């Protein structure tokens, strides 16, 4: 079977880059995926824990401050979607190029992806400052939440180019098999954020404004460190000299990045709609969903991290034409992620009230609503592992259309109608169960898309 990238010219790699190619295309896939997944899982867990710690500290202020985090989360999801578009799009291309031992084009693509991300983030930040209050109202803020949301949003906007660049760098490094170095950058930023949160929020008396300041500063440090580590351990170095944008390179980024853009954008849009629908039932409802979203993000972190360990294995071996290894890695990753999600779903269902109360103990109404929402989401959580792995697999092998469909399904195609219909038919109960309905429908859609593409791989 010819290599899918056989029309590309092979360029000389460094010994470290060739050694990495040999490792990713010959080592047993189960051990290989797990080895690459562990640092990615740690990075995701650290990020999830940071989000929870952020919520914990802000939760000590008042309900409106917690709700403000939920409002700005919609914005964060959208800018993350753009960062993932560049990071996953360029990263998928890079892993296939390195699978074909072409480090020259891989290095150019890495530079194009990162610089494009930073410039886009700067433009978004300027627009955000010009239209701050209308943007926050659009994202679902109420009049009582708006002052807190503005305080937090101000510093998030200042850090937007660096926040986005961190997400892009994380993806670029992971797709080269450098998850450990990426983990170091992510963990440094998260640890700094956890340290700065109580200092700024309580020590300096800045409140929710301090939480935004801590986030922006920590992301700047994280980005700087990852940029310094980019060319280590056989990674391709990034520099402005290699920033050579072209229509074809952006097409390649789009082919691999559109599914991530669709998934993350839908997450932001769904969060926006959820804020508006939940807002019909008061600030406590918005705060409840804000807390639960951070708990479920942490629960999903290790599962997504395991999928991120699968991605470079998939990309390298698909680029090298070793399709049996791609299939084996996919099946292994689906099994592990499903077992993990099932264990966490059971634990989350049993201890839902205790988990939510950790962050909003002072507001029993938020604790009650949040526990209900979390239990409903736990019912469908075991199904999400397979859906995520199918999406990552399709994205890495450049099956853009089915990958976009799967990416949009859980947070868009199914969740948004479920929110409106659920609210119309069942009231607040319908809003609470909307995510579980969307998860189940997405799983049913992913089954044929994943299996059919897996069976046809290498035969087309």
Range-by-range predicted roles:
Residues 35-54, 155, 189, 218-222, ...:
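Transmembrane helical elements of multi-pass membrane transporters/channels
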Residues 63-74, 149-153, 212, 283-294, ...:
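Small-residue hotspots at the loop-to-helix junctions and early N-terminal turns
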Residues 24-56, 60-61, 77-89, 93, ...:
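N-terminal transmembrane alpha-helices
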Residues 87, 156-174, 182-190, 211-224, ...:
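Short runs within selected transmembrane alpha-helices of multi-pass transporters and secretion channels
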Residues 78-81, 193-198, 222-227, 298-301, ...:
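Hydrophobic transmembrane alpha-helices of multi-pass small-molecule transporters
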Residues 66-126, 163-182, 288-352, 384-406:
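Small-residue-rich hydrophobic transmembrane alpha-helices
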Residues 45, 49-67, 136-143, 199-206, ...:
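Helix-terminus/linker motif at the lipid-water interface of multi-pass membrane proteins
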Residues 2-37, 94-161, 203-258, 314-380, ...:
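Short alpha-helical transmembrane segments in multi-pass integral membrane proteins
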